[in-house]
Structure formats: structure tokens, C-alpha cells
Amino acid sequence: MTNLTIGISTGIKDTQMSPGIIPCAVLSAEFIKLCNKFEAHAVIFPPQYNKPNFSLDGIDGLIVTGGGDIDPSHYNEHPSDKLERVSMDRDLTELNLLKKAEEKNIKTLAICRGHQLLNIHMGGSLHQDIPDAGFKDIDHAKPYENATKHIHEIEIDKNTKLNQILKVETLKVNSIHHQAINKLGDNLEVSARSSDGIIEGIETTNNWDAIGVQWHPEYISEDKASNDLFDWLIN
């Protein structure tokens, strides 16, 4: 199938522009390249400041991307002092995207922060900081400069959609996150974990076709697994 339109969420980042440093909606071009590789068009959904509720009419697939931490008020917790780059505008925009995608059964790939937000949308919660939660065997919070490197392995449950897509039971992934899923949301199952027990993959068990992955496939876009995920989303 060709000529599909994939909606991709993004955040706001202070960026050097001609007038100086100003807040801009930014997205890794790797997302666009991967969509175009499978003959799909990419459109961007930045955070909305006053109207987070908008339509997904004309959108065939959704990617909810990585970024800063999610406000813990969305899962009824007080904020940890380890939180970084929280944006309520982005939270509300992306939660609305997930709500609309579920209502319309739009195929969804949720990445890193998006994977965590998918869990929150389904009623789950997060570990606000992985080391504080007692997980110290793997350093999951590698600097952004290591985004293209394979940091650790994950194990994929063979009875899951993720396994059917990737056709492997172990996979080496990158890792640039300090938060992780705690309580699993409703109508979700765990598809992958790292050896320390951190949830690295989730997927829906209801009629909505949605997958969350804790790693960043767009930064290791030459990997077969990354291409298989985008092929699943688009085709």
C-alpha cells in the first residue's frame, strides 16, 4: 500500500535560528526518511498551546515520539526531583492523539516517551526514575550521543505481535531513558523486557492496533528490526 499519511508527534526545543535562540517544533529527519522509504508521507503534530483536541481525519498511521518526561499528575503521583523537560502542552496533545487513534483504530507506533504515554493512556503508571526504583544492573539513561549505539539486549515474548513483526526473540537496542513503565495499563500486554526486568515493549490486546517500544528505532534506522517496525506501521 502506498501514499499513506503518517502523523508524527513532536516536542518544542530551544533552537538557534536567525533571530537567536527561539522555541521550535523539532523532529528527527530519520522519521521522515523511514516513512518515505516505505512510500508514505509524514506530517507533524507539534504541541498545541490552547486546543490540544484536534482531528486525525486523513491520517493512516500514528507515531508518538520520544522526548522529555511526562507530568506524573496524569497517573496520580507527585513529581520526583529527577523529572526533566516536562511539558503539559505536549502531554495533553499526545494523550489526545492516542485517544483519537484508539477511537478510530489508527495503527500506532509509540516510541520511548510515547511508549510510556501509551501505558498512561491505558491507565498505567511509570517509575519516575529507574535507579530510584531499584533497577541498577543496566544504565538505561545513556547520553543522547549514544543514541546510535546498541547498549543492551531485550528479550521478546514469542507469543506477541512484536515477535511476529521482528521474528526474533532477542534484540540489541539503544537506550536513552531514565523512566520506565511501572503498573501496566488496561488492555495491554508486555512484549519485551531487558534482563533487569524493565519493560521494553508493550502492545494492545483490544481492537486497536498499537505497539510501544522503549528504544529508539529511528536512531538505528539501518537495523532490520527498525525497518520491520516501520514496514508494519505503514503496510
Where are the regions that the model predicts?
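Active-site-proximal beta-strand elements of phosphoester/diester hydrolases
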Residues: I211-Q214
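N-terminal beta1-alpha1 cap of cysteine-dependent amidohydrolase-like domains
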Residues: M1-L109, I120, H127, P131-I165, ...
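Hydrophobic, aromatic-enriched interface-forming segments
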Residues: H115-L118
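Conserved G/P- and acidic residue-centered "switch" motifs that form tight phosphate/ATP-binding loops
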Residues: C112
